Structure formats: C-alpha cells, structure tokens
Amino acid sequence: MNARRKKRLTLAVALIGGVAAIASLLLYALNSNLNLFYTPTEIVQGKKDTGVLPEVGQRIRVGGMVTIGSMVRDPDSLHVEFAVHDAAGGEILVTYDDLLPDLFREGQGIVAQGVLIEGGKLQATEVLAKHDENYMPPEVAEAMGQTHEKLDYNEQQKTSY
C-alpha cells in the first residue's frame, strides 16, 4: 500500500468514526430528553398494547385526576404529596417540592412531569393543572377516553345547564 492510499484510508476511517460518534451522541441526547406519557394504570400494569413498564429513573409524564383526600402538605416547606388516579383504577403517588398551580385542586385533572423514583411514585419537577372546568390536557383526555364509557345525555339533561 502506497502512502497516498494509506492517507485516504486513514481519512475515511476517521470520517466514519467521527460520524458514528456524532450520531451516537445525538441519539443519547434525544433519548435522555424524551418524556413518555403514561396513565397511572400503565405505570402499575404496563402499556396496554406492549406491557412495557416505565423504568425507575426514567423521565415520564403522568396524567389523571387528583384523588380527593390524598393531598398532604409539609407545613415547614413547599413539599406536597398527592395521589393521581384514572378510571381504570390505577393510582400513583406524586411528590412535588415547589409551588402548585393556582388552579390545582383535588378531583381535578393534572399532568405531572418528573422522574419515576420507585414503583408507583413520581418525583415531579412540573405540575400542570387544567385552566377551567371544561379543559383537559389532550394526553389525559385521550387516555381517559380509552378507559371511560361515554355518557349519553337525554334532552332534559342537556338543557338543564
């Protein structure tokens, strides 16, 4: 092998190695910033179609309704714990160490984003509450729609509002 071919081969190997390194770093960065949406039932039992459970330490988003009577506040700090449930019966505990949104209430729909710290417990970094009685985050509405039966109202019920 002459010097010219050796130089080209070295350049080609270095170029392929550089592209592979950049691609792997890019995939790693995208994977670490990926937040998958789960319902409380999916966290406990796994995704319905695949049965895949989220891993401890994984960043996820959880949507559901705040269980009435489950909120516990620490009087000396901003720490709060509450349970989130869905219609299928799944329930997880959420801990949060910041100010809750003004519209946060028990019995309301929320989306909490954070890290799963143990089975059925989420350390939230962000809590989003719906902004009026008719709004529900799209992910929660879709997940709840899959597990809730649609209500049929008669004409009297529709006009009583």
Swiss-Prot record:
The keyword rRNA processing does not apply. It is found in: Cell inner membrane. Pfam families: CcmE. One of its GO terms (cellular component) is plasma membrane. Keywords: Cell inner membrane, Cell membrane, Cytochrome c-type biogenesis, Heme, Iron, Membrane, Metal-binding, Signal-anchor, Transmembrane, Transmembrane helix. It comes from the Bacteria. It is a single-pass type II membrane protein. One of its GO terms (molecular function) is heme binding. Signal peptide: none annotated. The chain crosses the membrane at residues 9-29. Residues 30-161 are periplasmic. GO terms for biological process: cytochrome complex assembly. Residues 1-8 are cytoplasmic. Heme binds at H131, Y135. Heme chaperone required for the biogenesis of c-type cytochromes. Transiently binds heme delivered by CcmC and transfers the heme to apo-cytochromes in a process facilitated by CcmF and CcmH. Belongs to the CcmE/CycJ family. This is Cytochrome c-type biogenesis protein CcmE. It comes from Shewanella sediminis (strain HAW-EB3). The lineage of its organism: Bacteria, Pseudomonadati, Pseudomonadota, Gammaproteobacteria, Alteromonadales.
